[in-house]
Amino acid sequence: MENKFFLRLSFLAFAFLPFVLTAQSRKDRHLSSAEVLGVRADASVASAAPVQKLDTASIRRMGVTSTADALRRFAGVNLRDYGGAGGLKTVSVRGLGAQHTAVVYDGVTVSNAQQGQIDLGRFSLDRLAGVELHTADEGNLLVPVRQLGAATVVLRSWQPNAQNRGMHGAVALRHGSFGVWNPSVLLSQNWNGRTAVNVSADYYHGNNAYPFTVKNGVATHREKRLNSQMNDWTLEANAHHLLRRGQLSGKVFYVTNHRYLPGPVTLYVSGNNEHLTEQNAFVQLRWEQQYGRWNFFGAGKADWRESKYLDIAGRYPGGRLDQRYKQGEIYASAGASYVWQTLTAAVATDWFRNDLTSNLKVDNDVWRTSWLTSMTLRYAPRHFELTGRLVSSIFRNHATAGTEAAKNASQLSPSLSASWKLMSDQRAHLFVRAHYKEFFRVPTFTENYYYHLGNTHLKPERTQQLGAGVTFAGMLSARWQVQLTADGYVNRVWDKISSIPYNLFVWRTVNLGKVRAAGLDVALHSTWTLRNGQQLIGNGTYTYQRVTDRTDKTSEDYGKQLAYTPLHSGAVSMAWENPWVNAVVSMTAASKRWATNEHTVTTSVPAYADVNLGLYRTFRFRSFQLEARADLTNLFNHQYEVIRRYPMPGRAYRFSALLRW
């Protein structure tokens, strides 16, 4: 199976080779006088910490079909996907775990104090103008402290343009296999050239009853994925006001989601009767202002979240398990920076309060107050940049009478990053970088308080990150532009929070374990400009991750790869843009994984390669623009699993039309 996986990977790579050779073999390199030779190094190229970005053009050219799929194209990302639209989708970066990945939506962090991880399937790709991944340290100095995670996913929605006068809008309709329908609408209005508002609505429905094959020895049987239906409504409003040397933005967001949770497939039993209904609403404001050498920002957010979990099964008293949770958060952040020649100093502070209530008799109300402060200093002469940051974190836990509150926590977390510009001219840029960072996370409410599982005596999970890398961006010829990034790293985790069996029926969450992650991330972007308005855009990422248990040398699991962490993974895409119909072929792949830390035949999860094909074109008439697209996913109808016993969909189609004015 491993050999077949790498044969497919090699075949697709060689399939792209003729396009590359065609672009390089053209001897006529003459350019018109209007063309300018050169490449500009943007902030991500010169950053002292790795930054990966996708804008709407890149998303279109790479055949990306969802927000989770976009993140899967980044190097160093390990996506956990339980299959179908209703399956949970979270990301772990460089082996540190999903709880160490912060998610930022339009400048303010998205939180879930109960679970500690964000389901990225809830963010529709249609509402996003860009997706970024910041690994290790944040390149921007003046940011809320809360987004300074071990890794940060930055999501940017379409913002109203205060300088684009009049009424503008967009309507879209998407339809796909397995009963997927996804209409959406966005309206934007500018009143006076300084103030603009947009309102959007999005509905998603999917039956997700896709077929799959069950194997039992030599016998096979075809089944359909059951209990995977999802309905999702999202409403969002954004306001943007231009100030003199500043801006003020606000967001109101509401989503309600009802999904059936598909259970694991065990031989011929795939039925499940679990339901999850979630509601989330928040209001956030962000202010930015510049006064001479000073820059200021302020942000605030009020967040409410409710989830209702229902499992109908005979093993429960009364035949059902009904759990209801409510979360609330109040959040405030402010900061300032001062620039003096080659020195920049910044300070920011965050305060937030999270609370959780439930209908469980064994639980009482619990809440946590947090105060984070960061102090940053950057020295940036012409060809060198050195940034040091110190983060102070204080967490105080509280509970109503009768419930023991979790342990309080406080810590200082330093980080240091540097970037050197070895070469920079009109045609090429070469940067090298290095970083060191310490970070920790406090236990989630579930890890602290959940019945039979929680432990109020848990210590924070601590991490240490060390890495170095190089980025080259340049014009290799008059028509060939390349950007290549390579980063190596070693990460360590102490006091890792894990759940272990306490007896035959009860599990317990404890600080048990040390983890070491050593890896290599490589990313390549290349553009070949051809004749007659044609170009080839190639993208590729490769990740090597050796993430092992380093807890007990006498244990059988010592030195073994952690569960659901492939040793090799990657993605590749090639788009051909032309005056007729644009085409893109893409592939994501991962080597063999293990469902647990015990490496046996029964816990092995085979390697996979998922190939997609897309066609798209934009039509323009008067002030209207129509984008039409057709995608075929899992082209070879390969059945695979990202999570064991949760089969992914086979071959599927997807049609979409987007009208803008």
State where each predicted segment sits.
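Extracytoplasmic beta-strand/coil segments of soluble accessory domains associated
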Residues: 68, 72-112
